[in-house]
Amino acid sequence: LNAGADAVYVGMKSFSARKNAENFSDDELAAACMECHRRGVKLYVALNTLMYDDEIPAVEKCIKTAAECGADGLIIQDIGTAELSRRIAPQLERHASTQMTLNSVSGVKAAEEMGYSRVVIGRELSFEQIKRISENTSAELEIFVHGALCVCVSGQCYMSSIFGGRSGNRGLCA
């Protein structure tokens, strides 16, 4: 914030692709939202892992908590989570996580039709592919240019399971 960020991305204790990070408790999330908004900064909550049916009540709770704390939006991988967020907290922006593997014009347009206002496209794309997508969508686009150096396709990683016995698709990248 002190360096002038216009947005902050955070994870809660569950369903973040950075499961082993020191993610935010409900109280910490509320305080972070207040501080960000006091400074004119948006705060987005990452719910960017795959979900299973038995986790739906917990996902619903996370969505409600994010909305009640004042988050501006959610970064989502699972389309079921997107639908839940649309019903539970329609005021929240929905951003399609890079974990969704949206690497084509048709994929980005489908996300747009589902109500995503921003799409984080794959870091594997060439400049020409990025340009083609940007010329054919009204959704905001985001792309990682620094950070994780995945050797697989974003959102389709099984290397962590093979080498580390952990799932990168569930927030436990090895």
Please report, for each region that a protein language model flagged, where it lies by residue:
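As written
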Residues: 115-116
